[in-house]
Curated annotation (Swiss-Prot):
Pfam families per the UniProt record, alphabetical: TRAPPC9-Trs120
SUBUNIT field: Part of the multisubunit TRAPP (transport protein particle) II complex composed of BET3, BET5, TRS20, TRS23, TRS31, TRS33, TRS65, TRS85, TRS120 and TRS130.
Function field: Specific subunit of the TRAPP II complex, a highly conserved vesicle tethering complex that is required for the proper transport of proteins in post-Golgi trafficking pathways to the growing cell plate in mitotic active cells.
PANTHER family, A to Z: TRAFFICKING PROTEIN PARTICLE COMPLEX SUBUNIT 9
GO cellular component annotations of the record: early endosome; trans-Golgi network
Gene field: TRS120
Similarity comment: family membership: Belongs to the TRS120 family.
Organism of derivation: Oryza sativa subsp. japonica (Rice)
Listed name of the protein: Trafficking protein particle complex II-specific subunit 120 homolog
Superkingdom classification of source: Eukaryota
BP-aspect Gene Ontology terms: cell plate assembly
Keyword match Transport: yes
InterPro entries linked to this entry: TRAPP_II_complex_Trs120
Length: 1187
């Protein structure tokens, strides 16, 4: 069998092209051969100048106008075929020698070599030797026969010269064909095939051979007519041969003649596309196949079988019909030919058959069938034990890799912008077959001594099918990779990656890369309005943007290092040593830094790959360059993304990252990376350390911040602003300091101060700590609660003369002020106390307290201080309410606590009553050591409202009230607002401040605690009594003068102030003492009442008892009817006479007649008939005896 056969093959003249003379390089030989083969078709009309008709031509229907000769050049020649007499197209009818004269200076030797080479082809009818590039000396030598020199010239001249010589050769062949045909017609010829020479012929076979000789001669004459370009003459001879072969029963030659007639028919109508012609060709060729099959059955006893001609006929018809419309018919023909391969004795015939079947299936588009028969070809090549056969097997197997989707990357240029279908790239059901193909490529490449191909095959096998390979097999492939790499030069690159698997993990941008701000040339304050509210401008791996198609943008700066995080996985059972890995950048404006990585078996690792942008422009990073197993390969991120997507859909064998314990596949969008010109780079440093700034609540401190320009461009402009939470904790920023330092040159720095004040912690921060352990409760710092310094800065604006209005971008530096607010003093609890027992204070105590702060104010100041104390050393604190605050110091420092109450715009410091009552005198400050507590008492008597109003008792739910006057409703609302304002005023007047060390001070937030403590008793504290009683001592019947600075309506203040009897005004026994009781109406309505005055001794006995009276009196002391106008006072005088010295107390009480609802609500009466009794505080009197 012969390769590349077709129906038209019978019309091609076989010409052997042989190199002769000295050695010729393969490249030069290919160039010379291509120059010859370019003229494979020679028109008959062009042969007229070289053709001479010696006698009448046997080709009566020669188409000189449109016919042509077809030449088939065979480089290197071919072995003579035993079937040359059966098909003349198998003969080598011409020999062309190619000589490179610079390597063959002796023309005689060249001529001799050519004669010797041409002698190997006795069937050759013409010969020429083309000698190229002769020297001047060779050109002047005597010309030799059949040696044609081609002087050096341009390509066009060489082609024209060659065309002339090929035309001359073709004309010689045509004249030789005429001679051969004329001789064969006159004298006949003896034609033999291997079928005729197998055994000695008997008498019957001799007679049969003589009958068949004429028909065979007509068939051969038809072949020569076809070779001479006269299909009409050939068809006439073929028709005669067909009839004679049919009559003589020469089945084999009958099939040959019929096949020649089809060739003549097709060649004659080459330019036509006729369905009738196609049907005729198919009908005749099916007949030819049947005839060859009959001839095979007749000659099955012969050692040489003509089955190859049957298979060739099937291949010729399949090639003629090879198109999509006839796919089924062509496939049936090819599969039938494949079945007949078993009958072929010669292995080379089977090889050619499988090659042709694979080619035709590939032309038809049946890639898988073509790959299957290509593998059969490779198997036949591998049966031969030589390197050339192994190379052929490797090349054939390489053609099948596309069909099995295991092709090398170098054979398929991938488009990095478009992802191929996962289904077409990965088909797990082919895994076993794909492994077999790659293993065959690996074996053939090793036998062919091609280390790069063997490395590529082993890499694809290990990378794609590691889950199906045993650990021993994986180690064997690793050894094969290392052995192949040892035979390759250092730095060899391969298009097919091996291990590890690499996927893009993230872009961990440095803050200097995140904070890039575009500058608007039309806006002076370019930093306003364009930035986000938080400290981060760009977060690469979050779902951002309202448009799903918008691509994220990342700006890199020339000369500043950047990082890309990738994840490496080694799913195999051996240690993987990656000699170097770095980013693959195709844009050429990036310098990548290599790193080495060691991956243990079945592990993955995150690796940071870095580099420096070198030029302005776009940066493209499709993957990584890896130097592993001695070869450099490129690993593309998108290939691994396709692999992981296929694993997620179950289309590929395994996910290498999940096998190594990595997280689930997460697709990472590759951002658009732009490189901008060099920018300044400010680095902030908080003097004293970058940790948290520890501040107690309310503490004020200056923090120094240093800015250093670490870039290569000066800072021309800058702006410092505040962002984040608790911005009011920044009191001031020294703007003038850093502004005066502009411009900040590269390497320069500036230091400025920021004044901070710690804020008060929220209730959520002050959760109760049952253990009270300082380690558990002292440090409270919440993320996101700190303020930030937003520093926008930029370098020079560039060339002002340039027409480009765009400015280099600016930068944003975020300096977090990590303030850790610590609770300096803890308010454990607050509660309201009612003091109903006398609080005894010595006279010296009162004098020491009053003189400590107000020594220069005289006696009036002393009286004011005593009144503010709200405690009578003699009569106690009958109606006094004390607010107790329990404080705890959980820190490791000492605190001094001050309590102050602000009255009428002045701050009056309150004295602290420590829990230890043994103190001899009160102190302004209370010192609380570590892990100690103290209690602070705050009197609340001076906070009562001046008037008891009806509106204070209006129900909050007004739905029950009828629609009344809008003015009344407004008054009620105003009264409620006044009550709420009074409550808030009461709370705001109490201040608890602390001091610690030299500069640390603050204020304790007690508002909520006080409000909770006063929740139940706020009405009793704020609202005054309906009636206020006070006693006066009158000398000689006249009332003692009081402090004229008192307000007339401030009854509570007057009673409190004047109820204290001074030691300088003693009362003596056995003397008449004149007294007055003052009653004040604190309501807006007239009150009628019955007043009674009682006197008791220290035993609580009534001193006015008629039976055992110890005190005598003058005046009315019981059932005294009085009527007091709204907000007015009445005075009732009386006199008393003490018989026995001692301590006595006077007390006034009144029963209100016809009490109103307001009075009943204030008294919290349970029934409307219940009497309303108002009682005043006891008035203590100390009576001394007479000397």
């Amino acid at each position: 069998m012969e390769p590349g056969v077709s129906i038209e093959s019978g019309s091609a003249i076989r010409v052997a092209v042989l190199p002769v003379g000295g050695p010729i390089s393969p490249a030069r030989l290919r160039d010379y051969a291509a120059l010859v083969a370019r003229h494979a078709r020679v028109d008959l009309a062009s042969l007229r100048p070289y053709y001479s008709e010696h006698q009448k031509s046997p080709f009566a229907h020669q188409p000189w106008g449109g016919g042509c000769l077809r030449l088939k050049f065979v480089l290197g020649g071919c072995v003579p075929s035993p079937w040359e007499d059966f098909q003349s197209s198998r003969k080598v009818l011409a020999v062309v020698g190619i000589c490179h004269l610079p390597s063959s200076p002796d023309l005689g030797r060249v001529a001799a070599d050519f004669v010797d080479a041409a002698r190997s082809y006795p069937s050759a009818l013409a010969s020429r030797c083309f000698a190229f590039c002769p020297t001047d000396a060779q050109l002047v030598q005597k010309k030799r026969d059949n040696i044609i020199m081609f002087p050096p010239s341009d390509q066009q001249s060489l082609e024209l010269h060659m065309l002339t010589m090929i035309q001359d050769l073709s004309a010689s062949l045509l004249m030789e064909f005429e001679k051969w045909v004329l001789r064969a017609e006159s004298t006949g010829t003896i034609l033999k095939t291997p079928l005729d020479s197998q055994s000695s012929l008997g008498s019957e076979e001799v007679i049969k051979a003589k009958k068949r000789r004429l028909g065979r001669a007509q068939k051969i004459i038809g072949d020569y007519c076809l070779l001479a370009g006269s299909p009409a003459d050939a068809n006439a001879h073929y028709a005669t041969a067909i009839e004679l072969a049919r009559l003589t029963g020469d089945v084999f030659w009958h099939a040959g003649a019929l096949e020649g007639s089809v060739c003549a028919l097709v060649v004659d109508r080459m330019a036509e596309s006729d369905p009738v012609l196609e049907d005729e060709v198919k009908f005749r060729y099916y007949t030819i196949i049947q005839l060859y099959r009959r001839a095979t059955l007749q000659d099955n006893a012969q050692r040489v079988s003509p089955v190859s001609f049957e298979l060739e006929a099937a291949l010729k018809l399949a090639r003629y019909l090879c198109r999509r419309q006839c796919a089924k018919e062509v496939s049936d023909l090819l599969m039938g030919a494949a079945d007949g391969a078993k009958a072929l004795i010669d292995a080379s015939d089977r090889l050619i058959l499988y090659i042709e079947i694979a080619r035709l299936f590939g032309t038809l588009g049946y890639k898988r069938k073509a790959a299957f028969f290509s593998r059969q070809v490779a198997q036949l090549y591998l049966q031969q034990d030589n390197a050339y056969a192994a190379m052929s097997a490797m090349q054939v197997l390489t053609t099948t890799t596309t069909a099995y989707h295991v092709q090398s990357r170098k054979t398929s240029k991938m488009d990095h912008g478009l992802l191929k279908s996962v289904v077409s790239l990965f088909e797990s059901q082919w895994s076993t077959l794909q492994m077999v193909v790659l293993r065959e490529i690996l074996m053939s490449s090793i036998r062919a001594a091609d280390p790069l191909s063997s490395w590529s095959a082993a890499a694809r096998l290990l990378r794609s099918f590691y889950p199906l390979i045993t650990p021993a097999g994986q180690s064997g492939l690793a050894s094969s990779l290392s052995n192949s790499a040892d035979k390759l030069p250092s730095g060899t690159r391969c298009a097919d990656p091996c291990l590890p698997f690499i996927r893009l993990h993230s872009f961990p941008l440095h803050p200097s890369q995140r904070e890039i701000v575009k500058r608007n040339p039309n806006k002076k304050e370019w930093w306003t309005g364009g930035g986000p509210s938080g400290p981060f401008i760009y977060t690469p791996f979050t779902k951002g943007g309202t448009s799903g198609t918008s691509k994220q943008e990342v700006n890199w700066i020339v000369g500043e290092p950047v990082q890309v995080m990738v994840e490496l996985a080694n799913p195999c059972s051996f240690d993987l040593i990656v000699e170097s890995i770095y980013l693959s950048v195709h844009s050429g404006n990036f310098d990548a830094f290599p790193v080495s990585v060691n991956l243990p078996p079945n592990t993955s690792k995150l690796v940071l790959l870095s580099g420096i942008p070198t030029q302005v422009g776009q940066v493209s990073i499709p993957g990584c360059i890896v130097h592993c197993f001695g070869v450099i390969t490129e690993h593309l991120f998108k290939e691994v993304d396709c692999l992981l997507l296929g694993a997620a859909q179950g289309l590929v064998l395994s996910d290498p990252f999940r096998c190594c314990g990595s997280s689930k596949f997460k697709s990472v969008n590759f951002p658009s990376i732009s490189v901008v010109p060099p920018l300044p780079l400010l680095v902030a440093n908080v003097v004293g350390g970058d940790g948290s700034i520890l501040l107690y609540e309310g503490e004020i401190r200056d923090v120094l911040i240093t800015l250093t320009n670490a870039g290569t461009v000066p800072v021309e402009e800058a702006n410092v602003a505040l962002s984040g939470k608790n911005q009011d904790s920044v009191i001031s920023i020294a703007h003038s300091t850093w502004k005066s330092a502009l411009p900040i040159k590269p390497g320069g720095e500036v230091t400025f101060a920021v004044t901070l004040r710690a804020w008060h912690l929220s209730p959520t921060d002050l959760e109760a700590d049952g253990s009270r352990s300082p380690a558990n409760s002292r440090r409270i710092a919440r993320e996101g609660s700190n303020p930030f310094l937003d520093i926008h800065y930029a370098g020079p604006s560039g060339n002002s003369e340039s027409n480009d209005v765009s400015l280099p971008p600016g930068r944003r530096l975020v300096v977090p002020l990590n303030i850790c607010v610590v609770q300096g003093m803890r308010l454990v609890r607050a509660r309201l106390l009612s003091m109903e027992l006398p609080a005894r204070f010595t006279d010296a105590h009162l004098r020491s307290v009053s003189s400590k702060d107000n020594l220069s104010n005289g006696s009036d100041a002393i009286r004011n201080d005593i009144s503010l104390l709200k405690i009578d050393p003699y009569k106690g604190s009958w109606d006094l309410r004390l607010l107790e605050l329990e404080l705890f110091n959980p820190t490791d420092v000492v605190f001094d606590v001050d309590v102050s109450v602000h009255l009428d715009g002045t701050s009056v410091e309150q004295k602290i009553l420590p829990e230890d009552k043994t103190a001899s005198s009160a102190c302004h400050k209370t010192r609380i050591d570590r892990d100690y507590s103290a209690r602070v008492l705050i009197p609340l008597e001076h906070f009562k409202l001046p008037v008891l109003d009806t509106s204070f008792f209006v129900k909050e739910n007004g739905s029950d009230e009828p629609l009344g006057s809008r003015a009344a409703t407004l008054a009620e609302k105003n009264a409620k607002a006044e009550l709420n304002a009074s409550i808030n005023n009461l709370i705001s007047k109490i201040k608890v401040k602390w001091h610690s060390g030299r500069n640390s001070s603050g204020e304790l937030n007690i508002k909520d605690a006080i409000q909770t403590a006063l929740q139940a008793s706020i009405m009793d504290i704020l609202l005054p009594d309906p009636l206020t009683f006070s006693f006066r001592h009158a000398k000689d019947g006249t009332t003692a003068k009081t402090d004229s600075s008192k307000e007339p309506g401030d009854g509570s203040s007057r009673s409190a102030d004047e109820s204290v009897l001074r030691c300088k005004d003693p009362i003596f026994a056995n003397e008449m003492t004149h007294m007055e009781v003052q009653i004040r109406n604190n309501t807006k309505e007239t009150i009628r009442m019955n007043l009674s005055i009682s006197c008791k001794d220290v035993a609580g006995e009534n001193c006015f008892d008629e039976n055992s009276a110890t005190v005598l009196w003058a005046g009315v002391l019981s059932d005294i009817y009085l009527e007091v106008q709204p907000l007015q006072e009445v005075v009732h005088p009386f006199s008393i006479y003490f018989l026995v010295p001692g301590d006595y107390s006077l007390q006034a009480a009144s029963v209100i007649i016809d009490a109103t609802d307001v009075l009943r609500a204030r008294a919290k009466a349970e029934s409307p008939d219940e009497p309303i009794l108002c009682r005043g505080s006891p008035f203590h009197i100390h009576v001394v005896g007479t000397a």
